[in-house]
Amino acid sequence: MVQSFSSHAIAPAAVLRGEGAWSEALPRIQALCSKPLLLGRSSSTSQLRHKLTADLSAAGLIPASADLEFDCCERDLTRLHLESQLCDAVIAAGGGKVLDAGKLLAHRLSLPCITVPLSAATCAGWTALSNIYSPEGAFEGDVSLNRCPDLLVFDHSLVRQAPPRTLASGVADALAKWYEASVSSADSSDGLVQQAVQMARVLRDQLLIDSPAAMDDTNSAAWVRTAEACALTAGVMGGLGGARCRTVAAHAVHNGLTQLPACHDALHGEKVGFGILVQLRLEERMGGNRLAAQAHRQLLPLLRQLGLPCLLYTSPSPRDPIG
């Protein structure tokens, strides 16, 4: 029985998903704002964001645009806070760090937040949580927000244009939901946490089956299931389970790796995936968990098949690779 009061931000107020979701979202965006700030970062998504800006203008809105210089970083957020004073909503279009920055900026300005993931690399478009990094890319902490985004637009035609590496990274990040929750929350008596753990198990099973086919064919049903599992379903578990279902060893390893300049080019999920392998080794060697050894043997071939890093080398020669 849950003895204490708890508050949950479980899901965005509205979710539009599928082919053409962005076009369908425009009337909803009109209802939320008239002068949105469109936030992005990567030069690789600049053309997509120019199109989104043109669509907003064609819909009668007056959009402003801004780019992050760093990851979700206080230096950027301070600058954007000043630049967005005339805006009445924040639209974050990009990867996880752009989405985190947009959510946190909207939270601090008390403005509506619209997330438009341009990859399936994380579930940041869904959650009421933002990770903060230093200008150098080192993880500094996370901030819990009072609500999930007001609107999440998951347009398959936009997400499909992302590099395959981002989907592989999203698979690793989503898989961590099970491997971490099964350690942190397996003995919880909280019904919501129990249900989040079981959802994480089902999600893991689906990704083990679907993700290789999804990587091979972006027009397949497996791609849709995998991309939505990574960007949407994984976020549901965070909303239901809260802190009890995240940040065990896999994400702790990620957070540590961000302190190393040599790891800054690795995507979030690539570091998390390596962290899962570390966690399973710790469970096996320090906890005597034979199931962890079996899970390691099951997971390692998949991560390799998806092209995810499975070894940590120290220059100039490798030492005790985890994989």
Regions found by a protein language model. Give the residues of each.
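A glycine/threonine-rich phosphate-anchoring loop and its flanking beta-alpha core
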Residues: 13, 107-199
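N-terminal loops that bind phosphate or other acidic moieties
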Residues: 308
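Single conserved hydrophobic/aromatic residue that forms the stacking wall/gate
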Residues: 313-323
